[in-house]
A protein has these predicted regions:
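S-adenosylmethionine
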Residues: 2-175
Length: 175
């Protein structure tokens, strides 16, 4: 019954947002120009549900070992070695594995930049837009404790989350 109620609330919310929420006019005009005939397909997908994901912290556990103990039903994100889709309803932020730093909660498309950067142990890496820590924690895991990771952000309030996530992940070669 709870799932049905959540689904009904989700449907009502989507209908309300579709009717009442509009893209900023200048943004919509620019996207129409850029996408041309594909704009209607783009617009149709704006109402799609957002994907939710987790990324395994390979500094603390291998992907294989994590999958053996994973308390959620997960599906591989195809463009990463350690990213998985997870149902938001499973509440991965409430699980002790999250608080132990075994995984990071991250929208799957946000996993892309750090997963494609060819960072290796011993490299020196600078993340200028580091908060809240998604890229930095993945880059730190790739460094495997060797080299240097400098993570920063212009927002002091956001750096608190960055520091917390770096510490939770066990990254020791960060400043």
């Amino acid at each position: 019954i709870n799932s049905w109620i959540l689904l009904q609330k989700d449907i009502v919310l989507r209908a309300f947002l579709k009717k009442n929420m509009k893209l900023p006019e200048l943004f919509e005009e620019k996207m129409r120009r850029l996408l041309g005939e594909d704009f209607s397909e783009y617009e149709k997908h704006l109402d799609d549900p957002a994907y939710y994901g987790i990324r395994v912290n390979t500094l603390k556990i291998s992907v294989e070992d994590f999958l053996k103990i994973c308390p959620f039903h997960v599906t591989k994100v195809p463009w990463t070695d350690n990213g998985f889709y997870v149902d938001r309803e499973e509440k991965p932020s409430k699980h002790p594995y999250y608080h132990a730093g075994l995984y990071y909660i991250q929208e799957p498309s946000a996993m892309t930049p750090a997963s494609y950067l060819p960072v290796e142990p011993g490299d020196r890496v600078l993340d200028l837009c580091g908060a809240p820590g998604g890229k930095s924690t993945e880059l730190g895991a790739k460094l495997r404790g060797e080299g240097l990771l400098v993570s920063n952000d212009v927002s002091i309030s956001r750096t608190k989350a960055l520091i917390r996530n770096i510490e939770m992940f066990g990254i020791r070669n960060d400043m």
